[in-house]
Amino acid sequence: MSIQDKPFTIAGVTFSSRLILGTGKYPSHDIMKRCHESSGTEMVTVAVRRLDLKATGEASLMNWIDRNRLRLLPNTALCYTADDAVRTCRLAEELGMSKWVKLEVLGDEKTLYPDVEETVKAARILVKEGFTVLPYTSDDPITARKLEDAGCAAVMPLAAPIGSGLGIRNPHNIRLILETVKVPVIVDAGVGTASDAAIAMELGVEAVLMNTAIAGAQDPVRMAVAMKKAVEAGRDAYLAGRIPRKAYGSASSPIDGLVHH
């Protein structure tokens, strides 16, 4: 019996694509736009503190994002305190970007792991101010529950350090988070190639967020297509239900009516 599929919905908004992309590290704005189109994504993140607000025309990143098709998710990359993150979200709102935010409060410059205490603190403030908060967090079910209790619209545990491409390092913890919270779980960070995205989706998460895996590929547009297919295949595999793992082989051909010589 397969699992019944359900729409990917965040804060009452339903998305057809379960793939969320970033806007950084691409060889060019044109390639970024082509990747967004090829991937089928409907939501993209933008690092507010990296935006060149003086840029105009083709030099402006924002002019390469199709706001009619894509929901903007400003993020608080490079923030190391709750106060910085909250100020950055307020700036994004003032710039007319969005009240939806990817909350990212880092605790360490080397690993880029989240400071979960500051993340929860910022989440509580932002939710009270009416933001729809999607927090980048560790693969810890206790923190995930605290973020859900704070009013976050989803939780986004890392699969591995940001930009590492190490893949799904701790699938057990991702499963624990899925059992712990009722809001959507989105794997964020660590995906390196299409098989990583498929594995993440096979765990039962609602979506995958990535940037470097596509932007840093030798052929970003082709990788965007691969990621689209991987996310769809992983979701289908999760819904279909995999066979149990066994220690020994099991013949696939029936033995009834076997011809004996």
UniProtKB/Swiss-Prot annotation:
EC number(s) reported in the record: 2.8.1.10
Domain of life from the UniProt record: Bacteria
Active site, UniProt feature: K102 (schiff-base intermediate with dxp)
Subcellular location(s) of the protein: Cytoplasm
Pfam family, one: ThiG
Class of the enzyme per the UniProt entry, highest EC level: transferase
One function term, GO molecular function aspect: thiazole synthase activity
UniProt KW Transferase keyword: yes
Keywords for this protein: Cytoplasm, Schiff base, Thiamine biosynthesis, Transferase
GO terms for biological process, alphabetical: thiamine diphosphate biosynthetic process
Pathway(s) this gene product operates in, as recorded in its UniProt entry: Cofactor biosynthesis; thiamine diphosphate biosynthesis
Residues that, per the record, bind 1-deoxy-D-xylulose 5-phosphate: G163, A189, G190, N211, T212
Reaction(s) this enzyme catalyzes, per UniProt: [ThiS sulfur-carrier protein]-C-terminal-Gly-aminoethanethioate + 2-iminoacetate + 1-deoxy-D-xylulose 5-phosphate = [ThiS sulfur-carrier protein]-C-terminal Gly-Gly + 2-[(2R,5Z)-2-carboxy-4-methylthiazol-5(2H)-ylidene]ethyl phosphate + 2 H2O + H(+)
Keyword set includes Phosphoprotein: no
A GO CC term assigned to this protein in UniProt: cytoplasm
Subunit structure and binding partners: Homotetramer. Forms heterodimers with either ThiH or ThiS.
Matches recorded under HAMAP family: ThiG
Homology family: Belongs to the ThiG family.
Role according to the record: Catalyzes the rearrangement of 1-deoxy-D-xylulose 5-phosphate (DXP) to produce the thiazole phosphate moiety of thiamine. Sulfur is provided by the thiocarboxylate moiety of the carrier protein ThiS. In vitro, sulfur can be provided by H(2)S.
Protein name, per record: Thiazole synthase
